[in-house]
A protein has these predicted regions:
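Glycine-rich flavin
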Residues: 2-5, 21-174, 202, 207-211, ...
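Beta1/beta-strand and adjacent pyrophosphate-binding region of the FAD-binding site
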Residues: 2-13, 174-184
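Flexible, glycine-rich terminal cap/loop adjacent to redox cofactors
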Residues: 8-19, 24-36, 49, 53-60, ...
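Short hydrophobic core segments
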Residues: 8-10, 116, 136-146, 180-181, ...
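A Rossmann-like FAD-binding core segment of flavoenzymes
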Residues: 113, 117-128, 197-300, 371
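FAD-site-proximal beta/loop scaffold in flavoenzymes
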Residues: 158-174, 263-338
Length: 468
């Protein structure tokens, strides 16, 4: 095997493997180091992809139970086979990991299996499962090792009774009662999965609202929707302990306002309180500077404190910890290494919660705009007045567009919709090109589609929607 490269990427998650492919496409001799047996990182193996498989399957099951009969579809003797559902998820993941392997071969990227360390700025040492060390020379190094789940003090994740998101994607039977600690993206998606499949679900959230960082109008409405679906919430509550007794979990928590103590006994506890950068001792001991949050410090070109060593994705303190953000950074770094002008617009990175309905946003929230003392206008349009949503029985939610009062330029968009994750791309593109509400309002949208609600919300900025 050749041991000299132009670029060695450490980590084959969304940021790392995309960076490696783009480097190879730009003519750079590229290798990618990955410690796991499969490529794709957390996202592909135990995150974004398997969770979306279960979200889709569980929603199909819910519709068959609750909605098919109203449509004239009589699904008698409906049965749930969890093992088959999990097998379908695993097959999808395997196919996609094999797809990344194919792309590596297609682009002539050298896949190095093992753990990486950086003894010098031009050397990467790879240690395989048998502890054999091999040195590789390189002109540039890109660190994209992602993140891992965090827990709370005193709560030990065993992936049996007390689980991380990875464990909650692989239950071999449906828990009768599930407690989810954390009301963010991951917690709410997995709460939805297991509620649909039959679990009694309680979400405990430290704050007085769900999905921190989301527009308050959205989080308030979304909470109502999830309550209606049967998910229980304990907001403004602090978990003080979790114990396991005879394969059952006991969760103790206290209300932050009145100090009332409560206890719930359940079959499983999902700890979904966030993620932290995955920076191994082998990487941190290389002399690369970290910030106060233990993330790698980088400049505007994603270069660390050591020249020609770059970092992307969840290990740096730029933008949200999202797979598609890491992908964009991976492409930008590849272009920078190749002598081009790589760039990421952090003001136009969409975020999506893949529940049903979905929640999506891009740009600033109304709360952020108020804090920044920007004069603004708001346009809203409900899906109750959208024809496609009406015939599909998907009328929950609305689109909210916020624009600069003086320029009409779009500052932020938030929405709840059955297809919000797909719809938000239009708004990300609009913001990338500096569009105004009028630009969107004057753009012809196909009828009947959910996306017409975007056009109507843009019209509503000037209080003149057509259908509401």
């Amino acid at each position: 095997m050749d041991s000299n490269f132009d670029v060695i990427v450490i980590g084959a998650g969304p940021g790392g493997y995309v960076c490696a492919i783009k480097c190879a496409q730009l003519g750079l001799k590229t290798a990618c180091v990955e410690s796991s047996k499969t490529l794709g990182g957390t996202c592909l193996n135990v995150g974004c992809i398997p969770s979306k498989s279960l979200l889709n399957s569980s929603e199909m099951y819910r519709k068959a139970q609750k909605e098919f009969n109203n449509l004239g579809i009589e699904a008698n003797n409906l049965k749930l086979n969890l093992a088959k559902m999990m097998n379908n998820k695993n097959k999808s993941v395997l196919a996609l990991t094999k797809g990344v392997e194919f792309l590596f071969k297609k682009n002539k990227i050298t896949h190095l299996r093992g753990k990486a360390s950086i003894p010098t700025k031009s050397t990467v040492t790879v240690t395989d499962d048998l502890k054999k060390k091999t040195n590789f020379k390189t002109k540039n190094i890109v660190i994209g090792t992602g993140s891992v789940p965090t827990s709370l003090p005193g709560i030990k994740i065993d992936e049996k009774t007390i689980v991380s998101s990875a464990g909650a994607l692989s239950f071999d039977k449906i828990p009768k009662e599930l407690v989810v600690i954390g009301g963010g993206y991951i917690g709410l998606e997995l709460s939805s999965v297991w509620k649909r499949l039959g679990s009694k679900v309680t979400v405990i959230e430290f704050l007085d609202h769900i999905i921190p960082g989301m527009d308050k109008d959205i989080s308030t409405e979304f909470l109502k929707i999830l309550n209606k679906q049967g998910i229980n919430f304990k907001l403004n509550s602090k978990v003080t302990g979790v114990s396991v007794v005879k394969n059952k979990a006991v969760v103790d928590f206290t209300n932050n306002k009145n100090a009332t103590r409560e206890r719930i006994q359940c079959d499983k506890v999902l700890v979904a309180v966030g993620r932290k950068s995955n920076i191994s001792a082998d990487i941190s001991s290389s002399g690369i500077k970290l910030d106060s949050q233990n993330k790698i410090q980088v400049n505007e070109k994603f270069e660390t404190s050591i020249k020609n060593i770059f970092a992307i994705g969840d290990v740096i303190n730029k933008g949200p910890m999202l797979a598609h953000k890491a992908e964009d950074e991976g492409i930008a770094v590849a272009e920078i290494i190749a002598g081009q002008a790589g760039h990421v617009n952090y003001d136009a990175i969409p975020a999506v919660i893949y529940t049903s309905p979905e929640v999506a946003m891009v740009g600033k929230t109304e709360e952020q705009i108020i804090k920044e003392k920007i004069k603004y206008k708001v346009g809203k349009f409900p899906f109750l007045a959208n024809s496609r949503a009406k015939v599909n029985s998907e009328t929950e939610g609305f689109v909210k567009i916020i624009v600069d009062e003086k320029t009409d330029r779009v500052l932020g968009v938030s929405m709840i919709s059955a297809v919000a994750g797909t719809m938000i791309a239009e708004l990300a593109l609009a913001m990338e090109f500096g569009a105004s509400a009028e630009d969107i309002a004057r753009t012809c949208h196909a009828h009947p589609t959910h996306s017409e609600a975007i056009k109507e919300a843009a019209m509503a900025v000037d209080k003149k929607p057509i259908h509401f």
